[in-house]
Amino acid sequence: MHCYLLSVFLTLDLAAVALSLSTCSTLDMDQFMRKRIEAIRGQILSKLKLTSPPDEYPEPEEVPPEVISIYNSTRDLLQEKANHRAATCERERSDEEYYAKEVYKIDMQPFYPENAIPPSYYSLYFRIVRFDVSAMEKNASNLVKAEFRVFRLQNSKARVSEQRIELYQVLKSKELSSPGQRYIDSKVVKTRAEGEWLSFDVTEAVHEWLHHRDRNLGFKISLHCPCCTFVPSNNYIIPNKSEEPEARFAGIDDYTYSSGDVKALKSNRKKYSGKTPHLLLMLLPSYRLESQQPSRRKKRALDAAYCFRNVQDNCCLRPLYIDFKRDLGWKWIHEPKGYHANFCAGACPYLWSSDTQHSRVLSLYNTINPEASASPCCVSQDLEPLTILYYIGKTPKIEQLSNMIVKSCKCS
């Protein structure tokens, strides 16, 4: 009886070794590509909060230059970030996530002196918020993350219940009334609801300011479509009807709430003193960086530099170019016409040895439960965003879609 049980165990053991060499599914490139294309279709619609592609209208003969400018600057920023990472060999993200960070709070610079009335260039359609981060310049290379936080006040008199506000990085421009800008993020807010904090990731903008002081021109808060009226609940646009921001922000719209009364202005400032717009900077202390031991040799990156020049059946990055018109049947995305989405595929074999008991247990589990395989899968590791310029009706819109471009893979 004991010999029989031993024989069964060895048979299962050897079978498990063979099974453990497989990935989550059979390597069928055509199938992987079809699934990736359909996943991208769903991703784009989901990230834009659309249930179906917008109705198609004839594209305008010429896109407004200011729209093209925003698209180009946002696209170029993403490319600069990618180039910077490749050129400087940045610290591994695992180090940044592991070590404790020091947090610094930097309040917004006041618009005007304590007893003064705002200047005449105060705009009804946008707000400019500035910060002095010069004190942090000596620690610029240690910046891990920066968040812009602003408190939305309840506006019970708001004419609309919802508005989509957008945050831009202000760029150099000849005209103060019409600054250049780079899109960062957007949020839909309920204007009449109880006040709340809104947070935006502004790491890249602050990183740029710390290295180039002259580029620190602040942030711009504006509506999604100041030249029209945008209805977030159904993505409907009313053209040629300018919309004013109904969302109010502590420390920014104090003058609006005080109706020009200096006494009321002081009262509002005191009331919301703890809710001033501010930056939260998270830095990795220098002494923690200096105390790190020299890192061990890193694993070979399963990225384009390696995978595209080596024929691999194992887990690797696979090239895939998506043409929006050809592959998705879409004409509503104006720029780009397509992009290199890529995908991960290939086997993830276990490293088998007599002392790897963990692998032995996983393999036996894989044999007993084939439908719930514990084998590692080939998945994406590094992803980059994609900027698109598209139309809803005749209105151009620019969006940055996160995690759309696969840059490297791993077994997990």
Curated annotation (Swiss-Prot):
CDD domains: TGF_beta_TGFB2. Glycans are attached at N72, N139, N240. Disulfide bonds join C307-C316, C315-C378, C344-C409, C348-C411. Keywords: Cleavage on pair of basic residues, Disulfide bond, Extracellular matrix, Glycoprotein, Growth factor, Mitogen, Secreted, Signal. Pfam families: TGF_beta, TGFb_propeptide. One of its GO terms (cellular component) is extracellular region. It comes from the Eukaryota. One of its GO terms (biological process) is nervous system development. Belongs to the TGF-beta family. This is Transforming growth factor beta-2 proprotein. It comes from Gallus gallus.
